[in-house]
Structures are given as C-alpha cells and as structure tokens.
Amino acid sequence: KKIKRETEEDENENEEERNERSEMKRYAFGYPSGEEKKIKRETEEDENENEEERNEEGSEMKRYAFGYPSGEAKRMKRKPAEEETE
C-alpha cells in the first residue's frame, strides 16, 4: 500500500509540473495552447494562395503579351529550326 501511494503521489506531482509548464508556455507566447500553431498555419496557407495567384496572373500576362497560348511560341520557334536542318 505504501508503494502504491508513493507512485500515485509521484504521478500527481508530475501532472502538476506538466500543467505548470504548459501554463508558462501560454503566458510566454501569449497564446492559448495550440493557437500559435494555428495562426502560423493560416499565414502559411495565405502566403501559398497568394503565390499561386501571382503565378497564374504572370503566366496569363505572358500569354496576352506574346499573343500565343502556353508553349505555342516555343513550337513555332522549333518548326523553322527543323525546316532549316532538312
């Protein structure tokens, strides 16, 4: 019985220490548990979306600027080069 009580007391102390540490982290970072990760994830997702939009806009602008659909200008360059070698 004595050993069982000691292990229960140790477990309770360990749990209290974990709670204190997590509470200290919350105060240190200024966010409730897990909130900081969520905010970081949301900002990364927003950055990825913005980058995708920029890439789409850039490729669309190139198409309009050069007047050819994607890859068509390269094919047109290749054809005269192939005709010269024949």
UniProtKB/Swiss-Prot annotation:
BP GO annotations: defense response; neuropeptide signaling pathway
Tissue: Expressed by the skin glands.
Listed Acidic residues bias regions: 8-17, 44-55
Residues that bear Serine amide: S33, S70
Compartments, record wording: Secreted
Entry keyword Secreted: yes
An example Gene Ontology CC term for this record: extracellular region
Keywords: Amidation, Amphibian defense peptide, Cleavage on pair of basic residues, D-amino acid, Endorphin, Opioid peptide, Repeat, Secreted
Compositionally biased residues, Basic and acidic residues: 34-43
Chain residues in the propeptide: 1-24, 35-61, 72-86
Superkingdom of the organism of origin: Eukaryota
Gene Ontology molecular-function annotations: opioid peptide activity
D-alanine (Ala) sites (modified residues): A28, A65
Disordered as annotated region, ranges: 1-86
Family under the similarity heading: Belongs to the frog skin active peptide (FSAP) family. Dermorphin subfamily.
Protein purpose: Dermorphin has a very potent opiate-like activity. It has high affinity and selectivity for mu-type opioid receptors.
Protein name: Dermorphin peptides
